[in-house]
Amino acid sequence: MSNHIDRDVINALIAGHFADPFSVLGMHRTDAGLEVRALLPDATDVWVIEPKTGRKVGKLECLDSRGFFSGVLPRRKNAFRYQLAVTWHGQQNLIDDPYRFGPLLQDLDVWLLSEGTHLRPYETLGAHAATMDGVTGTRFSVWAPNARRVSVVGQFNYWDGRRHPMRFRKESGIWELFVPGAHNGQLYKFELIDAHGNLRVKADPYAFESQMRPESASLICDLPPKVEQPADRRAANQFDAPISIYEVHLGSWRRHTDNNFWLSYRELADQLVPYAKWMGFTHLELLPVNEHPFDGSWGYQPTGLYAPTRRFGTRDDFRYFINAAHAAGLNVILDWVPGHFPADDFALASFDGTSLYEHSDPREGYHQDWNTLIYNYGRREVSNYLVGNALYWIERFGIDALRVDAVASMIYRDYSRKAGEWIPNEYGGRENLEAIEFLRNTNRILGEQTPGAVTMAEESTDFAGVTRPPAGGGLGFWFKWNLGWMHDTLDYMKLDPVHRRYHHDKMTFGMLYNYTENFVLPLSHDEVVHGKKSILDRMPGDAWQKFANLRAYYGWLFAFPGKKLLFMGNEFAQGREWNHDVSLDWHLLEGGDNWHHGVQRLVRDLNHTYRHHKALHELDFDPYGFEWLVVDDHERSVFVFVRRDRAGNEIIVASNFTPVPRHDYRFGINQPGRWREALNTDSMHYHGSNQGNGGVVESDAIASHGREHSLSLTLPPLATIWLVREAQ
């Protein structure tokens, strides 16, 4: 019997409470020779085998009936490669001993991970297929600095935490182990004895695939190959490009009619992608696809940041969907949630028994609106985890843009909190300085590492410089959702037209701050839930007026400076609020031609016309690209403005937000000539009253509104028209 192993150590190993298994298990030099020790629960016979010859070189004695074996090889002085022939239940198995392999993490990786500057931590942490000393298997690593013991458990070891306790790298707080024979497709988790002695079983924070809820195990799989972003997709994200975004929740865009089940990623590739292309959108924005346990969160409470949800298929199926979108000429935007995470016990919450990823003080670490936990951005390993995740989706899946959710909740410590419910920053202010630095750092790194990919901020306050460079005090985003514009214009549109004259400024106010940020004009999922009604149902009047108002508003939206976003269903005027548990109301487009078809055709024409004319998108963020022609006609609720491209070509946009046609409506123009009606939301093609100007109107040498030439138009009721100057 070995004289080197204390009985207390054996007991601790078997009980799963020993933190340094490599100091005991494996091959060790002793005065008597090489000693091999193994913990093999339920084994009855163990031999040391020399792989080259298959010869038995020593038998291990059972020192504890619970599975601890040890044996001395007296003729051996130098460590050698060996295997173990283990008999379980009468059957012998030849295995490689995980405890004969050295440390896995390289010194540089350890240093970078500890410093929080490892750009791609997912290449090191988590589960990765590997071949070590000719043995194939999987190397596992997890950050849990305060755990007393960590084991990897899974289908390869009967989920038994005694079998594979991991090596602790004290300098980094990372636990690691190479498990021979563990292979792709197998399920696994990490079993921890936490800082307080409690047993916890956690999913891998870096898992590339996970089980679908309610199960929560991680899956071993290869790191996806890198995806390059070609020049055409980079160009499609630029400030002067036409950007029209179709925002989609994959689980409810369309469902199987027989069982209300989701479409798969591949079915969505075959149905959603060609539809979005046919409609003329340039970008698909996906509500979060990260793995999440609660359907009702719409993906905004993720537990698997690195894993596409299994609801719709495998990770490779998701890549197929992304590739299909790119092949159709659509860029893909992913909603990204670095602001908070749910408190589910299997995920990040109290990961090692301490507040590892979150703040310990609920005044900093608990989000009371959503019952979620807030990341501790000041902890380098946490910010590194998130920055690496942003790079992962762009580099490994070809995602073209990230839309960052709930930025305001990240950058303000008092967000949705009363006095006494939050802690000021070190200067006594309300700003979350660590979150601000995290966002700046993320945007800077993405700009350096993935040029052409962009980020968009959903930021609901007037924080200055969201889309300005960090060097100038900004956050470094490329685009910001203009929620103020959205609220103002919807507030205006819901009014009875007779009252709109008193709220004229709601439609013009956006231009007073238009050039402070690079704006996206969003009619998003948030505007069609929680009792807000659908966009159509917010419009006043009878059915005809509701549809006319909506069409006029869409005409205004697509002409106004800023990139465009419509949530699914808005493009055909769905009448009810969005419900994530069922399909959109596609039946509204069945049967004979109707008002919903009209709105759908209008949105398609708006998209294609918007993309065709540079004046409508080239100078969204340059004052030269916009000019009011009529801004003060509040009595008739009429607005007229010009959009302009770099070459000086103009498009005139005129909106009449009353049900009264305005005949002979004269206004001054900059460029005399013949103007063609490129789009009229009142056209019979869209189920309007078909009033207009016969397609073409000539300017007159009659002064108006301070200009020498003017146009006299018929402005249809509740309508927007676009006029394009024909070449002379």
Swiss-Prot record:
It holds the Pfam family GlgB_N. One of its GO terms (biological process) is glycogen biosynthetic process. The keyword Transferase applies. Keywords: Carbohydrate metabolism, Glycogen biosynthesis, Glycogen metabolism, Glycosyltransferase, Transferase. GO terms for molecular function: 1,4-alpha-glucan branching enzyme activity; cation binding; hydrolase activity, hydrolyzing O-glycosyl compounds. The active site is at D405 (nucleophile), E458 (proton donor). It is an enzyme of class 2 (transferase). It comes from the Bacteria. Its EC number is 2.4.1.18. Pathway: Glycan biosynthesis; glycogen biosynthesis. It catalyses: Transfers a segment of a (1->4)-alpha-D-glucan chain to a primary hydroxy group in a similar glucan chain. GO terms for cellular component: cytosol. Catalyzes the formation of the alpha-1,6-glucosidic linkages in glycogen by scission of a 1,4-alpha-linked oligosaccharide from growing alpha-1,4-glucan chains and the subsequent attachment of the oligosaccharide to the alpha-1,6 position. Belongs to the glycosyl hydrolase 13 family. GlgB subfamily. Monomer. NCBIfam families: branching_enzym, PRK05402.1, PRK12313.1. This is 1,4-alpha-glucan branching enzyme GlgB. It comes from Klebsiella pneumoniae subsp. pneumoniae (strain ATCC 700721 / MGH 78578). The lineage of its organism: Bacteria, Pseudomonadati, Pseudomonadota, Gammaproteobacteria, Enterobacterales. The gene is glgB.
